[in-house]
């Protein structure tokens, strides 16, 4: 339950968080569950609870009723993203942009066409050439956003989905050790925004 709650809290949509909840950009883990606090966000209270249409069942001790499922007023699965695997089958639903989902939902209600593509908290560049509208067999390619500061300096300001700054820096170090790159040093200045400075050998 703790890991699932942290995963929800890091998406910054359903849970108002307090304490150290870790960082999906750097890969830093959250504090132990007893050291973090959570409450449902105002958004969650608005879209996740609709008493007239919510089916319930008795709680484990029979004293209260608890919801079997929460019918959403918002395409939460597309916003959060999800992945899973079973015997011979797997699925991966990539996260999408909150505002784009709202606009697309309005288009559906108006019975008008729309296009929507995945969007990631960590930023990065995405190639949706072979996305296939999210259907089976579709794929996307993501990469870091790299700016050339000068001929000896590169700056990374966003990273691919499911990659951390720590993992990215490790891969740069390995490339340097194998001779694919010639790096003088790497500065990780990531705080509120991602910033990795790569100083190349002159």
Language model regions located:
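Catalytic phosphate-handling regions of large nucleic-acid enzymes and associated NTPases
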Residues: 1-139
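Gly/Lys-enriched N-terminal cap/neck module of very large, oligomeric protein machines
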Residues: 139-202
């Amino acid at each position: 339950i703790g890991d699932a709650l942290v995963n929800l809290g890091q998406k910054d949509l359903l849970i108002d968080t307090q304490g150290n909840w870790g960082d999906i950009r750097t890969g830093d883990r959250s504090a132990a569950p007893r050291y973090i606090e959570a409450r449902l966000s105002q958004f969650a209270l608005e879209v996740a609870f609709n008493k007239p249409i919510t089916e319930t069942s008795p709680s484990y001790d029979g004293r209260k009723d608890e919801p079997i499922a929460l019918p959403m007023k918002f395409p939460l699965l597309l916003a959060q993203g999800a992945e899973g695997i079973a015997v011979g089958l797997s699925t991966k639903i990539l996260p999408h942009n909150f505002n784009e989902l709202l606009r697309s939902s309005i288009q559906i209600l108006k019975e008008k066409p729309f296009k929507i593509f995945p969007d990631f908290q960590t930023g990065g560049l995405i190639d949706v050439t072979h996305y296939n509208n999210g259907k089976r067999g579709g794929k996307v390619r993501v990469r870091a956003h790299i700016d050339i500061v000068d001929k000896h300096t590169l700056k990374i300001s966003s990273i691919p989905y499911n990659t951390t700054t720590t993992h990215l820096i490790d891969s740069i170090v390995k490339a340097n050790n194998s001779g694919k790159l010639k790096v003088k040093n790497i500065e990780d200045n990531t705080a509120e925004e991602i910033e990795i400075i790569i100083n190349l050998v002159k």
